[in-house]
Amino acid sequence: MTNVPISRLRNFCIIAHIDHGKSTLADRLLQDTGTVSSRDMQEQFLDNMDLERERGITIKLQAARMNYKADDGEEYVLNLIDTPGHVDFSYEVSRSLQACEGALLVVDASQGVEAQTLANVYLALENDLEIIPVLNKVDLPGADPEKIKNEIESIIGLDTSKAISCSAKTGVGIPEILQAVVDRIPSPKDNTDQATKALIFDSYYDPYRGVIVYFRIMSGGISKKDKVLLMSSKKSYELDEIGVMAPDQVKVNSLHAGEVGYLAASIKAVADARVGDTITLVDRPAEDALPGYAEAKPMVFCGLFPTDADQYPDLRDALDKLQLSDAALKYEPETSSAMGFGFRCGFLGLLHMEIVQERLEREYDLDLIVTAPSVIYKVKMIDGEVKMIDNPATLPDPQKRETIEEPYVRMEIYAPNDYNGTLMGLCQDRRGDFIDMKYITTDRVTLIYEIPLAEVVTDFFDQMKSRTKGYASMEYHLIGYRENDLVRLDVLINSERADPLTTIVHKDNAYGVGKGLVEKLKELIPKQQFKIPLQASIGSRIIASEGISALRKDVLSKCYGGDISRKKKLLKKQAKGKKRMKSMGKVDVPQEAFMAVLKLNND
């Protein structure tokens, strides 16, 4: 199965914005090449997780090998490497691009170029990939392929004279795409005689075989008898099996340069087979690893706590297992007076955080409380020490610190220009600095802002979508740290500080956020048998307060008329009981209350 000459190999991926039809196109390619029979076909075939199908997004990388008979009568092997399209998963995209020689740039013919598409196209151009523009959804009534072609030329600078119009849904244009992959994407370089180097572009955990590693061989070859060495972890393994994804796994005896395959070697943890790492052979090792490997850095942090303290060991096991298939997830144990034992977790972004939470609840049957997300702050202490703080509750007191710096991102928003004003208003509310505004076409505009990451990780994306009826898209990247006048806002429930509700806010916004927070908590925390004071404070200064009135039994219901002193005695007795309850009572805060901090609008 693997005796295909290198000249007849093609490795490519599909670049697209969310909802532009990438997974449907991948399905159609698999079907047209006969890789998957029509009977076995299900929508979004390469999206294996239920969660991916439900949300209609691609999270984990998949790969599939297709055999295709081209117009010249030769049989070609096409390796499709599927990529995620969301900003949180750009690291996964960068790895899969490194494993390819070409890419299909899929653009919705009714919507045009979106921010995410651009970010990934630039990554592809950096990797010198051959890009084939494909206009999808041409069967839609609102499709305007010519206008979109001009847009691609003016924004990206790609020649669209050979752009292919297709409809992945109806199958129009699919044969042309397959032929273009053969004709226009170069075959891999023939480095079979060099030392073996293979790039790991994905790995997942299989409970029976250990970690399954997906790789692309850049030079040399790997056979089943070889002993392999992973260059960054310096660990060596005997191979149990190697094979190709067609798209189900098929064992083979050997693979050579240019091919994409998988291996199983009883590897215990994904941390040992890091994505982006280089595989080489123990007896003929390569001198240096492949370039461009960067460890994924978490941008957003939050606390995860089980609602039932007995589930703490289960949560730890679940996170361990999840990390086996998610190289970007970082976590460490933490405790909180209000919540007990839990974990402080780091994520690539908000979508990544939601997905991890949902997978923990769904696949491991856990009931979780998630605290508000925060970013990493750089705090300079009076004694000159610099601390990196990812948990607002651990921010040092004002008298001990000199300055606080927060991460800033450069954000590009693409939108129809009717929504210009409302988007600029949103960015200003979120402390954004206006940098530039460019008209891409007569009716589409790019807004460029520099904005604190902390303002983006809450509900910026939701707000942007709702203000523009879903038409805007954005892309951002980190540009460094800047000093700001930030304060720690604590929330006191029944005079006890609730750590998970602590946030770091700009001094000018503190009153508004504090007031909004206690008002929201008043709605969400159920009444107890005693009065609960809710307060927002900066240090020892209370800046906003609300109270939840007590539930009270009508102790006077049996007193019909009669002496007032009897009634007073009963009321006094009730008040005394409430006071005792208040000093001993614990307030249960529902999960919605913690999420309220997350969704609390800054406007």
Curated annotation (Swiss-Prot):
GO terms for biological process: positive regulation of translation; translation. Required for accurate and efficient protein synthesis under certain stress conditions. May act as a fidelity factor of the translation reaction, by catalyzing a one-codon backward translocation of tRNAs on improperly translocated ribosomes. Back-translocation proceeds from a post-translocation (POST) complex to a pre-translocation (PRE) complex, thus giving elongation factor G a second chance to translocate the tRNAs correctly. Binds to ribosomes in a GTP-dependent manner. Residues 7-189 form the tr-type G domain. GO terms for cellular component: plasma membrane. The gene is lepA. InterPro entries: EF-4 (IPR006297), EFG_III/V (IPR035647), EFG_V-like (IPR000640), EFTu-like_2 (IPR004161), G_TR_CS (IPR031157), GUFP (IPR027518), LepA_C_sf (IPR038363), LepA_CTD (IPR013842). This is Elongation factor 4. Its EC number is 3.6.5.n1. Keywords: Cell inner membrane, Cell membrane, GTP-binding, Hydrolase, Membrane, Nucleotide-binding, Protein biosynthesis. It comes from Prochlorococcus marinus (strain NATL1A). It holds the Pfam family LepA_C. It is found in: Cell inner membrane. It comes from the Bacteria. It catalyses: GTP + H2O = GDP + phosphate + H(+). The lineage of its organism: Bacteria, Bacillati, Cyanobacteriota, Cyanophyceae, Synechococcales. Belongs to the TRAFAC class translation factor GTPase superfamily. Classic translation factor GTPase family. LepA subfamily. The keyword Membrane applies. GO terms for molecular function: GTP binding; GTPase activity; ribosome binding.
